[in-house]
From Swiss-Prot:
<feature type="binding site">
    <location>
        <position position="687"/>
    </location>
    <ligand>
        <name>Zn(2+)</name>
    </ligand>
</feature>
<dbReference type="InterPro" id="IPR023696">
    <property type="entry name" value="Ureohydrolase_dom_sf"/>
</dbReference>
<feature type="modified residue" description="Phosphoserine; by AMPK, CaMK1, SIK1 and PKD/PRKD1">
    <location>
        <position position="250"/>
    </location>
</feature>
<feature type="binding site">
    <location>
        <position position="685"/>
    </location>
    <ligand>
        <name>Zn(2+)</name>
    </ligand>
</feature>
<keyword id="KW-0678">Repressor</keyword>
<feature type="modified residue" description="Phosphoserine">
    <location>
        <position position="1097"/>
    </location>
</feature>
<dbReference type="InterPro" id="IPR046949">
    <property type="entry name" value="HDAC4/5/7/9"/>
</dbReference>
<feature type="modified residue" description="Phosphoserine">
    <location>
        <position position="650"/>
    </location>
</feature>
<keyword id="KW-0963">Cytoplasm</keyword>
<keyword id="KW-0007">Acetylation</keyword>
<feature type="region of interest" description="Disordered">
    <location>
        <begin position="40"/>
        <end position="63"/>
    </location>
</feature>
<feature type="region of interest" description="Disordered">
    <location>
        <begin position="645"/>
        <end position="666"/>
    </location>
</feature>
<feature type="region of interest" description="Histone deacetylase">
    <location>
        <begin position="671"/>
        <end position="1017"/>
    </location>
</feature>
<feature type="short sequence motif" description="Nuclear export signal">
    <location>
        <begin position="1070"/>
        <end position="1109"/>
    </location>
</feature>
<feature type="region of interest" description="Disordered">
    <location>
        <begin position="187"/>
        <end position="272"/>
    </location>
</feature>
<feature type="compositionally biased region" description="Low complexity">
    <location>
        <begin position="485"/>
        <end position="495"/>
    </location>
</feature>
<keyword id="KW-0597">Phosphoprotein</keyword>
Length: 1111
C-alpha cells in the first residue's frame, strides 16, 4: 500500500492514468489509488516524503468504514472528466503537429510544382524558338531558291533572246562593231576626206535606233562632238580615272553608274580654275568668262553648284564651262583646223578625261530631248565653198527631214533657251530639233562673224557658234549622237547678246528667290484671313514663333485640302492634283509657249527648260496647295521670259512673286461652318491612360465621327483652323500666363530672353498619381504638344467666329479642346488654359468692330474665367446657367448676386441652380429659364454676335462630380434654335465640357442639326406638361428679383414660374391676343376721334374749286 501512496505524492499523474484501465472501477483499491488525484483530496501544501506519513492512517480509515455511493460516483465522474480533458489536449497537440507538417509539405509541393512548370515553359519556349529558327531558315532557303531560279530564267531568256532586243550581255555584233570603231579611231581622217557617207560613219550608228537605250557605240568625246574635237586615240581611257571602255546602252548596273558619276563629281572643279595639266585658257575663253560672270552660280539657271553630281542637274553652259565640251550643240559639223590637228597626243590628255557613257544620262551634256533622224534622207555633200552654200544645204536637209510649220527667222537676238519650233511629219515628239538648232546657229553665226578672228582651242567653251561660219563643212556629214533624256539642261547661248540675256535671267532669278522669302513671311499674316476649306490636318499651322513648323506644314499638310461635299465651287481634289503633278514630271516641268501663229507643239517645251527650271523650284511648296494652271505666254524677244506660269490663288500663302491674275478669296456657301483640327488630339497626359482623365482626345474624335456618320458634316462648310498668336491670347490673359502655356521648348528659345527671366524658366508642375504632370490633379500638361494644341483651339474658334461675323457663314460649331471658360487672366484650372470664347469676343470687337456680343454658357460648371474677363464690360453680356449649390459645386463662383461691376453692372447674369440633384435639373427647368430669363434679356440687349460656351456635362449620363443633371440632348437642340433668333442668326457654338462620349455626341448632333435648320424632334408631351421643381422655381425667382433692377423685361415673368410649358405657352398666346385686340381698339378710337375732329372743324369761306385743264 506504500507504493501507491508514494506515487500520489509525486508531481506527475501519468502512473495513475496507466493503472486505471487495468483496475476494475468498483474495487476499493481503485478508490485508494485515484483519491490523491482528485483536486480537493489533499492539501496543496503536502508534498515530498513528509506528506506521506498520514496517508496510511487515512486509507485505513477509509477502508475501515463503508464508502458513500454518491461520493464514489462523484469521484468517478471527476475522474472521467479529467481523462477527457487529457485526451482532448493530446488530440490538440497531435492536430497542431499534423497541421505544421501538412503546411510544410504543401509548401514543398508548391515549390516543386513551380519549378517543374518553369522548366516546362523554358522547354516550350526553346522549342518554339527552335521551330521559328527552322522556319526562318526554310523561308530563307526558299527565297534563295526562288532568286536562283529567277536569275537562271533571266539568263536563259538572255541567251535565247532575239538579236533585235536589248541585252546587258554584249552580243557578237556589238563586239564586231566595237572593234570596227576602234579601228576607225586609229585612222584619223584628213581635212580633205569629205566623202564619208552618213551610214558608214561610226557616230551615225545611232541613226538606226530611236531611243536612248538603243544608241550604239560611244564616241571619243561627248555625244555629238564635232570632228574637229575628236580626242587622241584612247586619250580618256588611259587617264587616272581608268573609266571602262564602254557600257551597253541597256546596262542595268546601278552601282557602276553611281561610281562613275561619283568619280566625275569628285574630279569636277570650278570652270574658272586652271586645268590640272597647266593648259592656258585661251583669249576667247577669258572673254567668255568676263561675259558670263565670275562665279559658278552664273553657269546655270537652276543655280546648281558646279560638280554637284547626278543629284544636281546642271545646264549645258555649266557642262561646257566645266568639262570643255560643246555638248549643247552636238550637231554642228566642223573640220579639224590645222592649229587644232597639231595638238600632240600627250599634251592634254586630262582635258577630255570626262568619260561619257551612252548608258548614263550625263545630265550636263546636250539638249534635253534631241533625237536622231532616220538615216535615209541626209546625203553627203562633197563640195562646199561658201557660207551661203552651207546654209542652203542645211535648209535642204531640213526640208528632206521634215516640214517647218513656221517661217525661218533670224535669231541673232533670240537666246538659245527660247528656240522651239514644231516639226511636222516626225514620229518623235522632239524630231529634228538638233537640225533646226544647227540652222538657227548658222544664221546667228553669220551675223556675229566679227568674233571669229581669235585663235581657238578645242576646249574653248564658246567655240561652237562662232566657228561655224569659217569652217568648210557639209551638212551631209552631220554627226549623229544618241538622244538624251531626264536632263535639265538647255542649249547654250551662242552670242554675246544671248550671254548677256542669260546673265539677266540669272539676276532676275535671284531677285525672284528673294521675293519668295518675302512672300513666305507675308503669307503668315495673310493666311490668318485666307479661306481654304479643307479636311482637318495633323500638322501645325503658321505662327510667328514657329517658322520651321510653318515650312513643314506647307510641305506636309497643305496637300490635304479637301473640297466640301456638295459645294458648287469647282475645286480640284487631291487625286487631280496628283495627276497634274505626275504629268508635270513626265513633261520635265516644261512651259508650253504659243508660237506666233497660235499653234503649240510638243517640241516647244524642252527649248524653254532653262527658263522653267527656276519656276519649278519657286513653286515647289505652293504646288502641293493649289492646282496648276498654265497660261499662254507670248514669246518675247526683248524681255526676260519670267511670266509663263500662273496659279490659281486659293490661298494667300502661295508665292506671289510673279504677275498672275488677282487673287480671288475663297467664297464659302452661306451655311453652317464646322472647324476641327487633329493637332488638338496631341494634348494628352504623358501616361497615355485616357480612363484616368475625363478630358481626353476621344471627345472631339467621337463628335467628328458622329457628324460624319449622320451626314451632317457633308452639309456644313469645313473651315481651316490655325494657331492663335501670342498677341491674340494676350487680349485676355497676362503676358506671363501667355508665355507660360503658349510656348514649347522648341519655340521658347526664339522669344525675347528678357521675357523668360524669372518664374517661367523655373516653372514647376504637379506630379499626378498616373505618372504624368499637370497644373492640378485634373488639368494635365504635355510639355511638347499642349501649348500648340491649346493655341490651335483658340485659333480655330477665332477663324470660325470671324467668318460668321463677316457674313460668310450662317453660323458655326467649333469642335475644339481643351475647354477654356475656367481659364482666368493668369490662372489655368478645370482642364482650361486659354479662354477661347473670351479671346474670340475681344478680337471680334477689336478687329471687326462688332458692337455687342452675347455669351451664353450652359456648361454645368460656372465659367469663372469668362465672367472675370467681362465683369465690368457693358458691351459683352454674359449669361450662365450652372449648378451652384450655394457655392459647394466647382468652381464655387457664379452666385446670382454677381451682376457685374462699374459700367458693366447688370451685364452679368448667373442662373445658379441650387438644391443638388434631388430632384435633378432637367429639360423643363432649362426651357423655363430660357423662357423667363435668358431670351427676354438677350432680346433687350440685341447682340450683334452670339457666342455659346456649349458644355454638355449637364446632359443625362454624367455622374454627380462632373454633372448629375438629366437634361436631354434634344433639349440643347431646341435651346440652340431659340438662340438663332438673335443677332440675325450669327451664332457660334464652342465645345466646352462634357465627358460622356454618347451624351456629348448626341448633344452635338442635335445642336448642328438646329444650326442647319434641320427639323428637330419635338419634345416629349410629358416634358411640356411637367412643372419645374421647387428648387428651380426658387432659383429663378431669386434671379428675376435681382436682375429686374437692370432688365425690366423679366419682371412680368415672376408670377408664372411654376407653370408648365403648355400653360405658359397658352398664357402667352392669350396675352398676345389681348395685346393685339387692345392695339386694334386703340387704333380704332384714334381714327374715330380724327374723323370727328375733321367734321367739326370750320370749312374755309372761299375754297377754290378745281379748274378744268385748258385744252
Amino acid at each position: 500500500m506504500n507504493s501507491p501512496n508514494e506515487s500520489d505524492g509525486m508531481p506527475g499523474r501519468e502512473p495513475s492514468l496507466e493503472i486505471l484501465p487495468r483496475t476494475p472501477l468498483h474495487s476499493i483499491p481503485v478508490a485508494v489509488e485515484v483519491k490523491p488525484v482528485l483536486p480537493g483530496a489533499m492539501p496543496s501544501s503536502m508534498g515530498g516524503g513528509g506528506g506521506g506519513s498520514p496517508s496510511p492512517v487515512e486509507l485505513r480509515g477509509a477502508l475501515a468504514g463503508p464508502m458513500d455511493p454518491a461520493l464514489r460516483e462523484q469521484q468517478l465522474q471527476q475522474e472521467l472528466l479529467v481523462l477527457k480533458q487529457q485526451q482532448q489536449l493530446q488530440k490538440q497537440l497531435l492536430f497542431a503537429e499534423f497541421q505544421k507538417q501538412h503546411d510544410h509539405l504543401t509548401r514543398q509541393h508548391e515549390v516543386q510544382l513551380q519549378k517543374h512548370l518553369k522548366q516546362q515553359q523554358e522547354m516550350l519556349a526553346a522549342k518554339r524558338q527552335q521551330e521559328l529558327e527552322q522556319q526562318r531558315q526554310r523561308e530563307q532557303q526558299r527565297q534563295e531558291e526562288l532568286e536562283k531560279q529567277r536569275l537562271e530564267q533571266q539568263l536563259l531568256i538572255l541567251r535565247n533572246k532575239e538579236k533585235s532586243k536589248e541585252s546587258a550581255i554584249a552580243s557578237t555584233e556589238v563586239k564586231l562593231r566595237l572593234q570596227e570603231f576602234l579601228l576607225s579611231k586609229s585612222k584619223e581622217p584628213t581635212p580633205g576626206s569629205l566623202n564619208h557617207s552618213l551610214p558608214q560613219h561610226p557616230k551615225c550608228w545611232g541613226a538606226h535606233h530611236a531611243s536612248l537605250d538603243q544608241s550604239s557605240p560611244p564616241q571619243s568625246g561627248p555625244p555629238g562632238t564635232p570632228p574637229s574635237y575628236k580626242l587622241p586615240l584612247l586619250g580618256p581611257y588611259d587617264s587616272r580615272d581608268d573609266f571602262p571602255l564602254r557600257k551597253t546602252a541597256s546596262e542595268p548596273n546601278l552601282k557602276v553608274r553611281s561610281r562613275l558619276k561619283q568619280k566625275v563629281a569628285e574630279r569636277r572643279s570650278s570652270p574658272l580654275l586652271r586645268r590640272k595639266d597647266g593648259t592656258v585658257i585661251s583669249t576667247f575663253k577669258k572673254r567668255a568668262v568676263e561675259i558670263t560672270g565670275t562665279g559658278p552660280g552664273v553657269s546655270s539657271v537652276c543655280n546648281s553648284a558646279p560638280g554637284s553630281g547626278p543629284s544636281s542637274p546642271n545646264s549645258s553652259h555649266s557642262a561646257i564651262a566645266e568639262n570643255g565640251f560643246t555638248g549643247s550643240v552636238p550637231n554642228i559639223p566642223t573640220e579639224m583646223l590645222p592649229q587644232h590637228r597639231a595638238l600632240p597626243l600627250d599634251s592634254s590628255p586630262n582635258q577630255f578625261s570626262l568619260y561619257t557613257s551612252p548608258s548614263l544620262p550625263n545630265i550636263s551634256l546636250g539638249l534635253q530631248a534631241t533625237v536622231t533622224v532616220t538615216n535615209s534622207h541626209l546625203t553627203a555633200s562633197p563640195k562646199l565653198s561658201t557660207q551661203q552654200e552651207a546654209e542652203r544645204q542645211a535648209l535642204q536637209s531640213l526640208r528632206q527631214g521634215g516640214t517647218l510649220t513656221g517661217k525661218f527667222m533670224s535669231t541673232s537676238s533670240i537666246p538659245g533657251c527660247l528656240l522651239g519650233v514644231t516639226l511636222e511629219g516626225d514620229t518623235s515628239p522632239h524630231g529634228h530639233a538638233s537640225l533646226l538648232q544647227h540652222v538657227l546657229l548658222l544664221e546667228q553665226a553669220r551675223q556675229q562673224s566679227t568674233l571669229i578672228a581669235v585663235p581657238l582651242h578645242g576646249q574653248s567653251p564658246l567655240v561652237t557658234g562662232e566657228r561655224v561660219a569659217t569652217s568648210m563643212r557639209t551638212v551631209g556629214k552631220l554627226p549623229r549622237h544618241r538622244p538624251l533624256s531626264r536632263t535639265q539642261s538647255s542649249p547654250l547661248p551662242q552670242s554675246p547678246q544671248a550671254l548677256q540675256q542669260l546673265v539677266m535671267q540669272q539676276q532676275h532669278q535671284q531677285f525672284l528667290e528673294k521675293q519668295k522669302q518675302q512672300q513666305m513671311q507675308l503669307g503668315k499674316i495673310l493666311t490668318k484671313t485666307g479661306e481654304l476649306p479643307r479636311q482637318p490636318t495633323t500638322h501645325p499651322e503658321e505662327t510667328e514663333e514657329e517658322l520651321t513648323e510653318q515650312q513643314e506644314a506647307l510641305l506636309g499638310e497643305g496637300a490635304l485640302t479637301m473640297p466640301r461635299e456638295g459645294s458648287t465651287e469647282s475645286e480640284s481634289t487631291q487625286e487631280d492634283l496628283e495627276e497634274e503633278e505626275d504629268e508635270e514630271e513626265e513633261d520635265e516641268d516644261c512651259i508650253q509657249v504659243k508660237d506666233e501663229e497660235g499653234e503649240s507643239g510638243p517640241d516647244e517645251g524642252p527649248d524653254l527648260e532653262e527658263s522653267s527650271a527656276g519656276y519649278k523650284k519657286l513653286f515647289t511648296d505652293a504646288q502641293q496647295l493649289q492646282p496648276l494652271q498654265v497660261y499662254q505666254a507670248p514669246l518675247s524677244l526683248a524681255t526676260v521670259p519670267h511670266q509663263a506660269l500662273g496659279r490659281t490663288q486659293s490661298s494667300p500663302a502661295a508665292p506671289g512673286s510673279m504677275k498672275s491674275p488677282p487673287d480671288q478669296p475663297t467664297k464659302h456657301l452661306f451655311t453652317t461652318g464646322v472647324v476641327y483640327d487633329t493637332f488638338m488630339l496631341k494634348h494628352q497626359c504623358m501616361c497615355g491612360n485616357t480612363h484616368v482623365h475625363p478630358e481626353h482626345a476621344g471627345r472631339i474624335q467621337s463628335i467628328w465621327s458622329r457628324l460624319q456618320e449622320t451626314g451632317l458634316l457633308s452639309k456644313c462648310e469645313r473651315i481651316r483652323g490655325r494657331k492663335a498668336t501670342l498677341d491674340e491670347i494676350q487680349t485676355v490673359h497676362s503676358e506671363y500666363h501667355t508665355l507660360l502655356y503658349g510656348t514649347s521648348p522648341l519655340n521658347r528659345q526664339k522669344l525675347d530672353s528678357k521675357k523668360l527671366l524669372g518664374p517661367i524658366s523655373q516653372k514647376m508642375y504637379a506630379m499626378l498619381p498616373c505618372g504624368g504632370i499637370g497644373v492640378d490633379s485634373d488639368t494635365v500638361w504635355n510639355e511638347m504638344h499642349s501649348s500648340s494644341a491649346v493655341r490651335m483651339a483658340v485659333g480655330c474658334l477665332v477663324e470660325l467666329a470671324f467668318k460668321v461675323a463677316a457674313g460668310e457663314l450662317k453660323n458655326g460649331f467649333a469642335i475644339i479642346r481643351p475647354p477654356g471658360h475656367h481659364a482666368e487672366e493668369s490662372t489655368a484650372m478645370g482642364f482650361c488654359f486659354f479662354n477661347s470664347v473670351a479671346i474670340t469676343a475681344k478680337l471680334l470687337q477689336q478687329k471687326l468692330n462688332v458692337g455687342k456680343v452675347l455669351i451664353v454658357d450652359w456648361d454645368i460648371h460656372h465659367g469663372n474665367g469668362t465672367q472675370q474677363a467681362f465683369y465690368d464690360d457693358p458691351s459683352v453680356l454674359y449669361i450662365s446657367l450652372h449648378r451652384y449649390d450655394n457655392g459647394n459645386f466647382f468652381p464655387g463662383s457664379g452666385a446670382p448676386e454677381e451682376v457685374g461691376g462699374g459700367p458693366g453692372m447688370g451685364y452679368n447674369v448667373n442662373v445658379a441652380w441650387t438644391g443638388g440633384v434631388d430632384p435633378p435639373i432637367g429639360d423643363v427647368e432649362y426651357l423655363t429659364a430660357f423662357r423667363t430669363v435668358v431670351m427676354p434679356i438677350a432680346h433687350e440687349f440685341s447682340p450683334d454676335v452670339v457666342l455659346v460656351s456649349a458644355g454638355f456635362d449637364a446632359v443625362e449620363g454624367h455622374l454627380s462630380p462632373l454633372g448629375g443633371y438629366s437634361v436631354t440632348a434634344r433639349c440643347f437642340g431646341h435651346l440652340t434654335r431659340q438662340l438663332m433668333t438673335l443677332a440675325g442668326g450669327r451664332v457660334v457654338l464652342a465645345l466646352e465640357g462634357g465627358h460622356d462620349l454618347t451624351a456629348i455626341c448626341d448633344a452635338s448632333e442635335a445642336c448642328v442639326s438646329a444650326l442647319l435648320s434641320v427639323e428637330l424632334q419635338p419634345l416629349d408631351e410629358a416634358v411640356l406638361q411637367q412643372k419645374p421643381s421647387i428648387n428651380a422655381v426658387a432659383t429663378l425667382e431669386k434671379v428675376i428679383e435681382i436682375q429686374s433692377k437692370h432688365w425690366s423685361c423679366v419682371q412680368r415673368f415672376a408670377t408664372g414660374l411654376g407653370c408648365s410649358l403648355q400653360e405658359a405657352q397658352a398664357g402667352e398666346t392669350e396675352e398676345a391676343e389681348t395685346v393685339s385686340a387692345m392695339a386694334l381698339l386703340s387704333v380704332g378710337a384714334e381714327q374715330a376721334q380724327a374723323v370727328a375732329t375733321q367734321e367739326h372743324s370750320p370749312r374755309p369761306a372761299e375754297e377754290p374749286m378745281e379748274q378744268e385743264p385748258t385744252l
